[in-house]
Amino acid sequence: MADPNACVFCQIIAGRLPARIVHEDADHVAFFPLEHINPGHLVLIPKQHTDYLFDLDAAAYQALWATAARIAGPLRDVMAAKRIGVAVEGFSVPHVHVHLVPINAFDDLNPARAQALDPAQADPLHARIRVALARAAPARD
């Protein structure tokens, strides 16, 4: 297991590094990555530091995907996307993370398309996504 104190995502969770957070609950945080494949690209992470997706216990695994599903609908609406593409690879940061990427075609989910996030574009988009997520129906237990 990687050192959580050295993990960039753990630093974001702790508030020691800035991030454009669009969703936070007791167990997860979703934010814009520094490089995005398409506008609206989000990264969803569990607050529990775990390196590999399949090392999460069953409850944490299910909660992660339930949170991804709750985010995907409003994100798709805001971005007027046909789909929300999902990618999990885990090599760039040793902390479980799910990429939620608005796409309109298969080729839209291509990491080679990643580019630096433009603050002029990101700030208004951040606000629109946060509002849409806040208006979405709360999770059912």
Feature-to-residue mapping (PLM):
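HIT superfamily nucleotide-processing domains
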Residues: 1-141
